[in-house]
Amino acid sequence: MSVNDKTIKRIAHLARIAIHDNETERITKKFNAILDFAKQLDEIDVTGVDPLISVIPMTLRTREDSITDGNKAADIVANAPVTEENFFLVSKIVE
């Protein structure tokens, strides 16, 4: 696959980028170089190679999930102007 000036102008239009006519040739060459590199990567035989998830092998420490209120309800509502039984009280806005 290769890119031509018409394609560059269309991409620029879709991206809402102003490109002058004297720039299209340079940008076309850069796009084609990127596509050629991607084609080279596509030609590499990776059969039998395990997918690389991370460069450094890591295992995450896990913990058992437990549901709690955090024992911080009083701290959370401490700055509220009006509360009742650890709930925020607000004025009625909509009838």
From Swiss-Prot:
Its EC number is 6.3.5.-. PANTHER family: GLUTAMYL-TRNA(GLN) AMIDOTRANSFERASE SUBUNIT C, MITOCHONDRIAL. Keywords: ATP-binding, Ligase, Nucleotide-binding, Protein biosynthesis. Heterotrimer of A, B and C subunits. It catalyses: L-glutamyl-tRNA(Gln) + L-glutamine + ATP + H2O = L-glutaminyl-tRNA(Gln) + L-glutamate + ADP + phosphate + H(+); L-aspartyl-tRNA(Asn) + L-glutamine + ATP + H2O = L-asparaginyl-tRNA(Asn) + L-glutamate + ADP + phosphate + 2 H(+). It is an enzyme of class 6 (ligase). Allows the formation of correctly charged Asn-tRNA(Asn) or Gln-tRNA(Gln) through the transamidation of misacylated Asp-tRNA(Asn) or Glu-tRNA(Gln) in organisms which lack either or both of asparaginyl-tRNA or glutaminyl-tRNA synthetases. The reaction takes place in the presence of glutamine and ATP through an activated phospho-Asp-tRNA(Asn) or phospho-Glu-tRNA(Gln). Gene3D superfamilies: Glu-tRNAGln amidotransferase C subunit, N-terminal domain. Signal peptide: none annotated. This is Aspartyl/glutamyl-tRNA(Asn/Gln) amidotransferase subunit C. GO terms for biological process: glutaminyl-tRNAGln biosynthesis via transamidation; regulation of translational fidelity; translation. It holds the Pfam family GatC. One of its GO terms (molecular function) is asparaginyl-tRNA synthase (glutamine-hydrolyzing) activity. It comes from Bartonella bacilliformis (strain ATCC 35685 / KC583 / Herrer 020/F12,63). Belongs to the GatC family.
